[in-house]
Amino acid sequence: LTPHYRHGMFDFDLDAINQAYEVMYAEAEKIGVMLYLGCEYHVDSGITHRLKSGRCLTMAGSDYVLAEYKYTSNYAAIRGSINELQANGYTPIIAHAERYEVFIRDTGLLDDCRSMGAMIQINADSVIGKEGLRTKSLCKKILKADLADIVASDSHNMKDRRSHMKEAYMYVSKKYGDNRAKRLFETNPGKILDVCQETDVEDC
């Protein structure tokens, strides 16, 4: 679960978030589903301070941070935030990388981000064309070059923003092989939970 945090716009109440998570966790556990809490952080100059102070959440209590940027962000700003997070012990996961103009113009920059230690996430809806043919084409380019690390749902509700993970998994498996699909949908996301469990399970 990754509620949005954007300073001055989505300043969530952490206590309320934790209470809601506990209710959802208990209900999901009844059907054998494990839920983990994090947040999608709209990157700003105060990101490391808020993370270290506990005012914002990492992914499942790990050192991974789901980082969102302005769609018009320049590459210098993105590089700078990656370096800052890395220097403070965090691993950034660039959320829905297919949406940013800088990567639309040059997908090769994704490889540069990865070389700095960032992970690249793309949306299931984008992969299967729910966000338009242009975005689907870009995801094809990213996947063909093996520049993505994680495919995630970006689901917001069960109506117009429901999850299409199954369809996306089947598409990736058919186009790029089952090993690639497992890596993007299972293995790499699972690494975040493995790190969490190795450090302190009760914090997850």
What does each of the following model-derived ranges do?
Residues 10-121, 199-204:
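Extended substrate/RNA-proximal surfaces in nucleic-acid metabolism proteins
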Residues 132-135, 177-178:
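Glycine-centered helix-coil hinge/cap
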Residues 2, 147-163:
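Short acidic/histidine-rich active-site segments
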Residues 122-124, 139-153:
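Conserved short secondary-structure transition element at the edge of the structured enzyme core
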